[in-house]
Amino acid sequence: MSLVAQAFAASKIVPDVIPTPPSVNIELKYPSGAIASQGNELTPTQVKEQPNVSFNADPDSFYTLVFTDPDNYDGPELVYREWHHWLVVNIPGGDVSKGDVLSGYIGSGPPEGTGIHRYVYIVYKQPGKLSFDEKVLTNKSIDGRAAFSTKKFAEKYSLGAPVAGNFYRAQFDDYVPLLYKSLGV
């Protein structure tokens, strides 16, 4: 079992988010200089801007990138549903900037008092260029982000098992209220 697969299993991303772990790492470098590394702790301040994403990719294939928080809270109770932060599809080769953005990037914003959250990046190799019928979401609102299921999304579009993944952990910091204000929360 690869180190990525071991980290996903140890952190319970398998089975909380996906049934099968990826085996290859996604490199995630943020403009702040922070680097995600299979469960290290970063701050919302460090990850507020969209990262540079790289992964081993076949230049003739298309990929889907999902960024999700499976530790979503409704008030003080953990409700075990995902809140997706970024969704990019039809990525040609590994060039995320040329993919179709279905959900604009929103950085981590764990509510105060909810402890540490897992923030998970998953890449799927698509069977070809696909048509997606999801509502396109901007990064200016939280509408349509909650109650997401990476597993159901992957099943709906026949994406198969994930090919790459990475994650970090984060908890509330002073940037979170600023993020909420920018989202109208």
What residues fall within each predicted segment?
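N-terminus-centered regions that define maturation/targeting leaders and the start
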Residues: M1-V185
